[in-house]
A protein has these predicted regions:
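Short, amphipathic alpha-helical interaction segments positioned at domain boundaries
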Residues: 396-421
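Flexible, acidic/Gly-rich N-terminal and inter-domain linker regions that tether
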Residues: 1-39, 49
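Short alpha-helical scaffolding segments that buttress acidic/His motifs in well-ordered protein cores
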Residues: 54, 341-346, 402-403
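A short, conserved structural fragment
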Residues: 376-386
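Minor-groove-contacting beta-hairpin "wing" of winged helix-turn-helix DNA-binding domains
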Residues: 387-392
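Canonical Radical SAM [4Fe-4S] cluster-binding loop centered on the CxxxCxxC motif
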Residues: 34-69, 157-158, 162
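Short amphipathic alpha-helical interaction segments
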Residues: 362-376
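C-terminal scaffold of the Radical SAM
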Residues: 61-80, 89-362, 421
Length: 421
């Protein structure tokens, strides 16, 4: 689609600029503002095996590295407490946070003691949906996100996940068995793998419906330059020309018809209509600002992006020296902050125009005339009044494509930083 290609190139230009982190000698992140609500993100980068399509900050699991890492993650958490930060919500991502379950539980328990958390979300893989692990997470974790990616065994073998994390049927059975142990269980899926056919996608959707998961997130394949070669070798070349068609198939199955099983939670997250309390997967939608701890974490604070060291060894050294792990910073201009707000709120399906005017002192159209006109031109806005903007199906896909490119840009920053490690 022409408009999507134009937008993609534009987003790449902007992300290249405002993800261009400059080294910083700051000993810590900025402190909190009294009226601001924050979510805490903690990153655990260790995985049993490294998937060929993934370029998130991750390293092969080595216990001698992981034990001090978890200890230092808890120490960095104490640093935030000493700075005056408070949190009601903690999101632990990876990597595979459950790779050392006792260390993870100790980290969650400390966070609850320090901050009085109301909710904890963490990620895991299907092979960790075992009774001994679930029993430790249940009650500690309100929302569990399971990285399935696909239920198709052919794709799982190409992804090098089948032997490590289990077959599609094994994953489905484990999800069904674990679902009631948590307030919300989210299934993470990926669509538009090079070798994925429409029939494979339809089967994945059928498995989701059978699982009756509280929530499902369908991410488009995000191929950063560092994994392009391994991805092409194992799965083939990515074809973006069919991405929108696959996305609309997902939306139709999950949200279409007279009695749809799911409703939109964000542009790529779907929550079960039968579960009013389902927690949305995207912490960046619910909270505009967030500090991140752990190797490779990205914080958005005080109108700027901060990046933590991508080296596990350097991370441990910095924390043990009494510093936080931040090593880079990109200050945002007012226009950058507007673009970030525009992207994140529309990704969350509704832009709050009143809040925009309070924060920026102008209308959306005046603040971002090019972006606003572009979205109007391509028919991305379904509804607009003095208070809000809502999206059409085309608009939702444009946000999926936009966020895909944003995260590809983030992953490129990770790639470049890891090359220097």
């Amino acid at each position: 689609m022409l408009f999507e290609r134009i937008q993609t190139r534009t987003v790449r230009l902007f992300t290249h600029r405002y993800l261009g982190f400059k080294p910083t000698a700051l000993p810590a992140l900025p402190g909190p503002h009294p009226q601001q609500t924050y979510v805490l993100y903690a990153h655990v980068p260790f995985c049993k095996t490294l998937c060929p399509y993934c370029s998130f900050n991750r390293y092969p699991f080595v216990q001698e590295q992981a034990v001090p890492y978890f200890k230092n993650l808890r120490q960095e958490m104490r640093m935030l407490k000493d700075m005056g930060y408070g949190f009601k919500s903690l999101y632990i991502g990876g990597g595979t946070p459950t790779i050392m379950i006792d260390e993870l539980c100790a980290t969650i328990d400390l966070a609850r003691d320090l901050f009085g958390l109301e909710e904890v979300s963490t990620e895991t893989n299907p092979n960790h949906l075992e009774p001994q692990i679930i029993s430790k997470l249940s009650g500690r974790v309100q929302r569990l996100s399971v990285g399935v990616q696909s239920f198709d065994d052919r794709l799982l073998k190409q992804m090098e996940r089948h032997d490590t994390y289990g077959s599609g049927m094994e994953s489905l059975e484990r999800i069904i068995a674990a679902k009631d142990s948590f307030d919300s269980l989210n299934v993470d899926m990926i669509f538009n793998f090079p070798s994925q056919t429409e029939d494979m996608l339809i089967n994945d959707l059928a498995c989701i419906l059978e699982s009756q998961a509280n929530q499902v997130t369908f991410y488009p394949l995000m191929a950063s330059p560092s994994v392009a070669r391994s991805l092409a070798r194992s799965l083939g070349q990515v074809d973006y020309s069919r991405e929108e068609r696959y996305y609309q198939m997902i939306c139709e199955v999950l949200t279409g018809g007279k009695h749809p099983p799911y409703a939109f939670g964000s542009a790529w997250t779907f929550k079960a209509i039968s579960d009013e309390s389902a927690m949305i997967d995207e912490y960046i939608v619910d909270y505009e600002e967030y500090p991140a701890i752990g190797s490779g974490g990205l914080s958005y604070l005080d109108g700027g992006l901060y990046v933590n060291t991508f080296s596990v060894e350097e991370y441990n050294d910095l924390i043990e020296a009494g510093r936080m792990s931040v090593i880079g910073k990109t200050p945002f201009t007012t226009s950058d902050r507007m673009r970030y707000r525009f992207m994140m709120q529309l990704f969350g399906l509704q832009l709050d125009k009143r809040q925009w005017e309070r924060d920026f002192g102008c209308s959306v159209a005046a603040g971002l005339p090019v972006e606003y006109s572009f979205f109007k031109l391509v028919g991305a806005f379904a509804f607009e009044d003095d208070e809000k903007i809502l999206l059409t199906p085309r608009g939702r896909y444009l946000l999926v494509a936009l966020m895909r490119e944003f995260f590809v840009g983030v992953n490129k920053v990770r790639d470049e930083a890891r090359q220097r490690v």
